[in-house]
Design a protein with these regions (language model features):
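Conserved beta-strand -> loop -> alpha-helix junction used to position metal-binding or nucleic-acid-contacting
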Residues: 242-249, 254-290
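RNase H-like nuclease fold core
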Residues: 94-97, 105-109, 144, 153, ...
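Short, conserved DNA-binding cores of transcription-related domains
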Residues: 1-109
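Active-site phosphate-binding and catalytic loops of NTP-dependent enzymes
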Residues: 55-71, 160-172, 184-189, 389-391
């Protein structure tokens, strides 16, 4: 098949490139050679375009002084390193004496790679790749040298998006909100410190699941949760029917201070873990079987009777277990008042713990984050990737919604 005839522009370019390769004794053996030539071509094209922009800015071309109608003039060039898909290159940026020239093809503070490469880097960062891995990947696949600082600058573009996401308006009413914290190590002022990432996941009245917010703070505290709850209210949340939380001291009081009508369900799985961690291996299985008779009981009355029986049998060796269950019973037993479908939804924080496990898969390559911001960037990007699969609503949502309408008739009357 005959080659398609070149356009005049392509023919001129083909001739120019042929002369360039021949006169400079350039041979093209691999992709590295191609990238080198492309960098030279791109720099020439960009510099020519920048000179044209300067001509338009001043109103006269470089040596056409007779048509000069401005007191401004050219003032040499400054050099800038551009990170492109073909590697780093130096280009000359024209300057004017008054400093008024604002180039558009290469903006004043633009020196990063192309948009396509930025998206590749952000995608790799979102999947948990370290900066060293990203550097190696870009070097091997694209023959591009990219520094830690460049990767950081590119991923920093996420931070304003994260801020906007954290402040976005929310639904007026959520059927259930799950709240939990996940912990990471961060470098701070030369020391490695522990950070808690506070996470809230809501299920709205249509059954759709959404991450309402992620916040980096000190070790988990009810005081910080109080500020988060106030933030949710300021973003438009007027009511939460049921809040599912761990056993953090003061958490129920923090919720009640902001959403006084919210039912609180303390996570049963957290309670089991916290109260059985010091039980001997030999006795763990029979003790757990007796404890299951409490939380798996069909009614609260039966559960309370089973707890009393558990207390009599085990408190000689493990007095703190039954005491903890009794002390927290008001919030542990909330789910007993609801039918089975709602119980399955709220009696554990599996919804948020599953999300946390997916976050850990992404962040497992980072034992220590260089800053709070770098931690938040990676978690946000991971969250975006994870929640792409959160389409539709729960399979049994129709049943759950009908039951919630009965139990919360007054609070849902305005919907």
């Amino acid at each position: 098949m005959a080659r398609k005839k070149d356009t005049p522009q392509k023919a001129a370019l083909r001739e120019m490139m042929g002369n360039y390769l021949k006169e400079n004794n350039v041979t093209v053996k691999d992709g590295t050679d191609v990238n080198s030539i492309m960098r030279d071509m791109m720099s020439i094209i960009l510099e020519g375009a920048l000179d044209q922009e300067m001509d338009e800015e001043l109103g006269y071309s470089k040596y056409d002084y007779r048509n000069k109608e401005t007191d401004n003039s050219r003032n040499g060039h400054s050099q800038k390193t551009m990170h492109t898909s073909y590697g780093d290159m130096e280009i000359d940026i024209p300057r004017d004496r008054k400093g008024e020239f604002e180039p558009q093809i290469v903006k004043k503070y633009q020196n990063t790679v192309t948009q396509d490469m930025e998206e590749k880097i952000i995608s790799m960062y979102a999947k948990g790749m370290t900066t060293t891995d990203i550097e190696s990947h870009m070097r091997e696949l694209y023959d591009i040298e990219i520094s830690d600082s460049t990767i950081s600058r590119i991923t920093d573009k996420i931070l304003p998006i994260v801020k906007e996401w954290q402040e976005r308006p929310l639904e007026e009413i959520y059927a259930v909100v799950f709240m939990d914290a996940i912990h990471y190590h961060v470098r701070n002022e030369g020391r490695i410190v522990k950070r808690a990432v506070y996470i809230a996941i809501g299920i709205d009245m249509e059954g759709h699941k959404d991450v309402l917010g992620m916040y980096v703070g000190q070790n988990e505290s009810a005081k910080f949760w109080l500020s988060i709850l106030n933030g949710l209210k300021n973003r438009g949340v007027e009511d939460i029917l049921i809040a599912c939380v761990d056993g953090l001291t003061g958490f129920p009081q923090a919720i009640e201070a902001v959403f006084p009508d919210t039912e609180i369900q303390q996570c049963i799985i957290h309670q089991i873990r916290n109260t059985t961690k010091f039980v001997s291996y030999k006795e763990l299985k029979p003790l757990m079987a007796d404890l299951k008779r409490v939380y798996a009981a069909p009614t609260e009355e039966i559960a309370r009777a089973e707890l009393d029986g558990f207390d009599e049998k085990w408190s000689g060796k493990y007095p703190k277990i039954a005491k903890s269950w009794k002390d927290n019973w008001a919030n542990l037993s909330t789910y007993f008042k609801y039918p089975e479908a709602v119980r399955r939804l709220i009696y554990t924080t599996n919804t948020i713990e599953g999300f946390n496990r997916q976050l850990r898969k992404v962040t497992k390559s980072k034992t220590v984050f260089p800053s709070d911001e770098s931690l938040l960037k990676m978690l946000y990007l991971a969250m975006v990737d994870i929640t792409k699969k959160w389409t539709g609503h729960r399979q049994d949502w129709g049943q759950i919604h009908s039951q919630l309408e009965i139990f919360f008739e007054e609070r849902l009357s305005g919907l």
